[in-house]
UniProtKB/Swiss-Prot annotation:
<comment type="function">
    <text>Catalyzes the transfer of the 2-phospholactate moiety from (2S)-lactyl-2-diphospho-5'-guanosine to 7,8-didemethyl-8-hydroxy-5-deazariboflavin (FO) with the formation of oxidized coenzyme F420-0 and GMP.</text>
</comment>
<feature type="binding site">
    <location>
        <position position="87"/>
    </location>
    <ligand>
        <name>7,8-didemethyl-8-hydroxy-5-deazariboflavin</name>
    </ligand>
</feature>
<keyword id="KW-0808">Transferase</keyword>
<dbReference type="GO" id="GO:0000287">
    <property type="term" value="F:magnesium ion binding"/>
</dbReference>
<dbReference type="InterPro" id="IPR038136">
    <property type="entry name" value="CofD-like_dom_sf"/>
</dbReference>
<dbReference type="InterPro" id="IPR010115">
    <property type="entry name" value="FbiA/CofD"/>
</dbReference>
<comment type="similarity">
    <text>Belongs to the CofD family.</text>
</comment>
<comment type="pathway">
    <text>Cofactor biosynthesis; coenzyme F420 biosynthesis.</text>
</comment>
<dbReference type="InterPro" id="IPR002882">
    <property type="entry name" value="CofD"/>
</dbReference>
<comment type="subunit">
    <text>Homodimer.</text>
</comment>
<dbReference type="GO" id="GO:0043743">
    <property type="term" value="F:LPPG:FO 2-phospho-L-lactate transferase activity"/>
</dbReference>
<dbReference type="Pfam" id="PF01933">
    <property type="entry name" value="CofD"/>
</dbReference>
<feature type="binding site">
    <location>
        <position position="48"/>
    </location>
    <ligand>
        <name>7,8-didemethyl-8-hydroxy-5-deazariboflavin</name>
    </ligand>
</feature>
<keyword id="KW-0460">Magnesium</keyword>
<protein>
    <recommendedName>
        <fullName>2-phospho-L-lactate transferase</fullName>
        <ecNumber>2.7.8.28</ecNumber>
    </recommendedName>
</protein>
<dbReference type="GO" id="GO:0052645">
    <property type="term" value="P:F420-0 metabolic process"/>
</dbReference>
Length: 307
């Protein structure tokens, strides 16, 4: 199975999938449009979250970073008057140093990610969407800013006017991702932010055509008229989409076969048929590992119903 993932929402579903499927059968294609260089090192927030999840290092209270990490380097730099745009843990920083040294030595982001997965003892296939630089910028009333500045620096507070995924039209789908699509017919779009997490992946040249030839199931990150977490609602509005499960399904409709939305959502299950897809209700909140596993089992079972 191929899973398209950002750094929030989908990792909880991955937590369930890794309990019910052989790890070597999972290929996670991860958004890299939120990557940025901090203090000379390349930070890949979404990739790191997925790597830490599959290596059982993730801080499950925050669902990012490494559990029980320390912040001595960050604090020392602050003492010396050097401000970093992200609060990086010491062990987390080691990941960034290894990645950056590999890339400076001529290694691709894919190769660096495979190396990190090996160092962490991960059997699943964790891949960046592309080896080319892609960056998401958010146009706000306070000016244009990198997504990390908007979300981490400004806490997602500025009003959003638009979203620009820079470099995506010139980028290529990573070779190993293409190889995965040649071998697997089942694609799951996780409940990550459709605009800034999944959007960059499906905007890569040729990706939509690949998805049209596969069985595609998506899980909604929206319940009612609000996202489960993060700034998806504000970003969807700026892109002209209704903030609802229907709005998410419309965004994916050209390649979507089955759409899973929350059982608490009042949306009409049959209304999705006009988009050319089926819809199924489930508990999508994933408040525990057991709930994640239950949703994973439900979604995996749906693939057998797709022709």
């Amino acid at each position: 199975m191929i899973i398209l993932s950002g750094g929030t929402g989908t990792p909880k579903l991955l937590d369930g999938l890794k309990e019910i499927l052989p790890l070597e059968e999972l290929t996670v294609v991860v958004n890299t449009a939120e990557d940025l260089w901090v203090s000379g090192n390349l930070i890949s927030p979404d990739l790191d979250t997925v790597l830490y999840l599959f290596s059982d290092q993730i801080d499950r209270k925050k669902w990012w970073g490494i559990e029980n990490d320390t912040f001595r380097t960050y604090e020392r730099m602050h003492e010396l008057g050097i401000e970093e745009s992200m609060k990086l843990g010491d062990r987390d920083r080691a990941t960034h140093i290894i990645r950056s040294n590999l890339i400076r030595g001529g290694t691709s982001l894919t190769e660096a990610t495979v190396k990190l997965a090996s160092l962490f003892g991960i059997d699943a296939n964790i891949l960046p969407m592309s080896d080319d630089p892609v960056s998401t910028y958010v146009e706000t009333l306070q000016g244009v800013m990198h997504f990390q500045d908007f979300w981490v620096g400004k806490h997602g507070d500025p009003d959003v006017l638009g979203v620009d995924i820079r470099g995506v039209s010139e980028a290529s789908v990573a070779k190993k991702v293409l190889e995965a699509f040649e071998k697997d017919d089942n694609v799951l779009i996780g409940p990550s932010n459709p605009i800034t997490s999944i959007g960059p992946i499906i905007s890569l040249p040729g990706m939509r055509e690949l998805l049209k030839r596969k069985k595609v199931i998506a899980v909604s990150p929206i319940i009612g008229n609000a996202p489960v977490s993060g700034p998806a609602g504000k970003l969807m509005q700026a892109c002209g989409l209704e903030v609802s499960s229907m709005g998410v399904a419309e965004y994916y409709q050209e390649f979507l076969d089955v759409f899973v939305f929350d059982e608490r959502d009042r949306a009409d299950e049959f209304a999705f048929e006009r988009l050319g897809c089926r819809a199924s209700r489930a508990d999508t909140l994933m408040t525990s590992t057991e709930k994640s596993r239950e949703l994973a089992e439900f979604v995996v079972g749906l693939f057998d119903t797709v022709c």
